[in-house]
Amino acid sequence: PSFATPGFDVVGCGLNMVDQLVMVSEYPKPDSKQQITRMEYSPGGQVATAMVTCSRLGLRASYIGRFGDDVHGKWGLESLSEEGVDTDACLTAEDTPNGFSIILVDRERGTRTILWSRPPALDLAPSDIQPSLVCAGRVLLVDCHDTEASTTAARCARAAGIPTLIDVEYVRPGIEDLLAQIDIIITSEGFPFELTGCESAGRSLRAIRDAYKPAMVCMTLGKEGSLALVGDAEIRTQGFRVPVVDTTGSGDVFRGGFIAGWIHGGNSTSAADVLRYANAAAALKCRKLGARQAIPTSREIDTLLRA
């Protein structure tokens, strides 16, 4: 894109959460008792964590989302401000607890299982979307949780000539209309198969490209990196080997790293280089427990890329 210079580099519209992370030596069996080896609380949520990543990587980031008015909601909102993310566009639901997750982390495998709760009063509606706010950046990131609101936001951005990205995990009602408004589709590993019914990764990405006409469609592959399709070109980017403590939030950091690598690199940067930058950011995040504790700096990413 030909990036303009509005108030922010990136605006993110979507989910925030607060996580309680519970580490155990191995995943508990049914009807068993398991000692907790470590426990922490951390702010999280897909888009909120991606905006923190962008801010740590030197971008001017704004977050649009709704918080509860309990202690978790207040903490989640404050955590963004402390990270330099603008929260002037945020909303609060009265007498409503914030979105909350309990995350079981298997210490031996580095894997996690998420149990979550998000009251419907926290949902964003299309009427919550103000064009002047979602179009205040050079790039817009949305997720797939409140599909109608995300579709409205993406339409506003596209009408203003602002590139749109999505972090999409699940097939939900309205997802087709949403994807049709997106320029860069970044999916979880399973989403392309669920959406298209195709049995191979490459074929499923091509089906998404043909149906929704994005400039890029990419699936994250965990420790194996990512697979992207730009036009007819497949770009497979290897993951980075780092000591893994917890993968919570790694996909969110991948999206934030992608946006930062794209904006910092400008039009001269190749898609492969942007994807390597995003993979490095996501890998380094896994060094600590929690979605945001180990989000890397630009220097840490550059060091890993040169290694």
Which residue ranges define each predicted feature?
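Glycine-rich phosphate/adenosyl-contacting loop at the front of the ribokinase-like
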Residues: P1-R66, V71-E82, E108
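Gly/Ala-rich phosphate-binding loop of Rossmann-like dinucleotide-binding domains
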Residues: S55, R158, I263
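Conserved phosphate-binding/catalytic loop of the ribokinase/pfkB sugar-kinase fold
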Residues: R66, T92-A93, I103-V139, C144
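Short gly/ser/thr-rich secondary-structure transition/capping motifs
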Residues: G84, P119-A125, T164-Y170
